[in-house]
């Protein structure tokens, strides 16, 4: 069995780790970095860039550079959160035929699962390069507060990337695994996870290798991206006041503002003041305009204070659901890059009444935990039991549009629960089961996961038929629902797939696209390798021809020069096969030149040897003077 890798698929950055003996190890990518920006770009010539190369060109290619796409995963186009994002990002968010939010570049649409798959492919390649073997299984993390549609979309992304997703694991739970694996830590902990796009808090009980999640809460649209946008809006407003130009209308300027905001935010975690300097940010009739501004930590904290405060209520709800007070929490573990912000640490300290634990790397701990879970599934990590929970209540719509819960939030998974319902009208021969997830009392206010019909109910007075509805949640938090008429034993069941979501046909098409892209990437790589090889041969042949060309026949020299000319011409194209053919032709033609060079070398060596043979070794006899000298008395 090959290695199973652990992947933290983040909003801003992603990370991959693997078990190395008894320890989990983060793997560096091709650029030598331990985390990879979760950014995908389409270049002018249609090449797909992922990670750091995509981030580097974002300023000059804002409309075809997709970032923070995780926030769109499993969301509908008309979702209020998507509406909010549409105003803030320079790339196009469009409505797919199934009503989901997708992204578009150059008329080509991509689902968020597909964009996530490009990032997962990069993680897969990073692991394969490190391990020297093919990787096709993974554990992938998601925010604890992700609903069923978002979890399913993440699993789809893994499939598109060519990975069998053995387990979807919650990010705070993964962090707790990494924190508590050494078995010495026991007690109750809170994991406060403020990442690039999402916020989660989980309360866990740890002891004797058992990691039991007591409760979880969060906000899937709150993270570092929101902090960045606050600063972007502030900078744009200040510039408009000074210069009368709205930078939000210029996508290129907006991308530069975003990069500057992210940089300033990071710097203000370790310094109390920073300077934002963006020369030639725009221009008008009077000439170019520059943006220069000093920003203090206090000002930045004031701008984002309400965002930090938004993390408090989920923490209180999680404590309440776990039946605990803040004082009963033994340790608070900080996860996610945003927890480096002093203001965030201060709020956590005030809320829990203790200094938060900073002994884990907030950018890497989730991937490390995912790799540990991969080790558990592979049998490499023993005596670890993970008991997670479902973050939101699950139920169906009943008479009057009421949401009737079948599985309450924070129920340990996997789990299976049933409840018996009946018909609302006389002689009703079919029922529609509408499945929802959420905490509101009316079904319409919650997230609909899907619906199906149970047909063929025998005619009876209302309230007589007994219809048993069963919810089954697997260890990934993904839901299956069945309905059974107890009188006829007729049953209908579905794996919940949101009214949007990707169909199997969509996924198959995207898998094929990904494979085709992998072939295209391979072709490009082969062309580059062939060019490098050809360039080296051209250089060495030209040098040899200049130094030793006189030692071959004129016809042979002309053949070499012709082959050189042909190869130089083929180097102008990207046709790897043509380049390889011309390279072989030149290699064959220049063999005579090589023979002449070796012949000259051999003659030179022979001459040196002959000169050495002319040297006469002198015979000598050693005389022992002591024998010839007599001792005197």
Curated annotation (Swiss-Prot):
Region (Disordered): 515-537, 599-633
PROSITE patterns the UniProt entry points to: HSP70_1, HSP70_2, HSP70_3
One MF annotation (Gene Ontology) recorded for this entry: ATP binding
Induction summary: By stress conditions e.g. heat shock.
Compositionally skewed regions (Basic and acidic residues) per UniProt: 605-615
Modified residues (Phosphothreonine): 198
Function: Acts as a chaperone.
Family of this protein: Belongs to the heat shock protein 70 family.
Annotated protein name in UniProt: Chaperone protein DnaK
Organism: Rhodopseudomonas palustris (strain BisB5)
Taxon lineage: Bacteria, Pseudomonadati, Pseudomonadota, Alphaproteobacteria, Hyphomicrobiales
